[in-house]
Each structure stands twice: as C-alpha cells, then as structure tokens.
C-alpha cells in the first residue's frame, strides 16, 4: 500500500513539475518514532491526512495524531519553522486540533473548514479527500508552523 501511495505522490508532483526526491512515506507507530529516526534526521514538513479521529471516550483522544502528546514527538524531528499540513473530514477532530497545535507550540498559519470551496492551487487531492468530497463532506485543513522550543 505504501508503494502505491509513493507512486501516486510522485505522479502528482511530476504533473506539477515539483521534484519528489526528498519525499518519504512512512508507516510508523508514533510511540516508536524515536526509534525510527536519529537526532540528526530533520523534517521540514509532515502531512497528516485523514487519520483516525479517535473518540473522546475514555481518554482515547490522546491517540490522535494531532494531540499535543503526539505533536511534541514530531517537534523533536522538526526544524524551527517546519510545518505540519493536516486534512480531515471529521469536524470534532478538526475543532479540537485547532487548540492542540498552539498547546504544543505550533502557530496555525492557515486554516479552512471547506478546502474545496476556494481550493488553493497547491492542494494535492488525496484519494480519501476525493471520496469524502464526492459525498458532500467538507474537507477541513490547516497548516501549522513549529515555533521556537521556548514556546512549549
């Protein structure tokens, strides 16, 4: 599945004339993120697309990929000013994420509750994005920039 995803990303980048030589697709357990990267590994952008929204029951929201607990782990790999691009169809997850990012020292620099209403030319539609959009479900999206470590 990851090979197909990488091929789709490479094709989408090629169609827009964007080099994809530095794109890495990884399927990792966030709890083991530190085991997969060295302190020298740096990330300039992370995409979180249509992740499991996890209900708020019994504290399961801490498993959300945008929960501050997870965002703090991403921060360890990110240079100051690096970005997280996040898309979801889930209203509750998006609303909660609007507070999660600042709590973890990220500044939300762009957000929308309906990505396709005024779709930016830089948006690369994912398969899930197309599927939800065809069902009339608005796609929520944001870009968050990592602030200085002193903000956490």
Where are these regions (language model features)?
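A short SAM/SAH-binding and catalytic strip from SAM-dependent methyltransferases
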Residues: 31, 37, 43-65
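Conserved SAM-binding loop
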Residues: 5-6, 97
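Compact, Lys/Arg-rich rRNA/RNP-binding cores from ribosome-related proteins
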Residues: 5, 64-68, 90
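A short glycine-rich, Lys/Arg-flanked "PGG" loop and its adjoining helix->strand segment in the class I
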Residues: 62-83
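Class I S-adenosyl-L-methionine
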Residues: 94-152
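S-adenosyl-L-methionine
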Residues: 6-45
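Conserved class I S-adenosyl-L-methionine
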Residues: 57-60, 83-104
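Short, well-ordered alpha-helical microsegments
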Residues: 2, 33-34, 94-95
């Amino acid at each position: 599945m990851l090979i197909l995803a990488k091929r789709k990303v490479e094709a989408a980048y090629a169609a827009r004339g964007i080099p994809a030589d530095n794109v890495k697709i990884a399927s990792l357990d966030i709890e083991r993120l530190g085991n997969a990267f060295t302190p020298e590994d740096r990330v300039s952008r992370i995409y979180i697309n249509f992740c499991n929204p996890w209900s708020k029951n019994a504290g399961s929201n801490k498993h959300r990929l945008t929960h501050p607990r997870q965002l703090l782990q991403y921060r360890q790999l990110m240079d100051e000013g690096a970005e997280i691009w996040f898309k979801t169809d889930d209203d509750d997850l998006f609303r909660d994420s609007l507070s999660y990012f600042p709590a973890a020292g990220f500044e939300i620099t762009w957000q929308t509750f309906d990505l396709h209403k005024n779709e930016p030319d830089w948006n690369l539609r994912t398969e899930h994005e197309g599927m939800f959009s065809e069902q009339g479900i608005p796609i929520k999206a944001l870009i968050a920039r990592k602030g200085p470590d002193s903000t956490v």
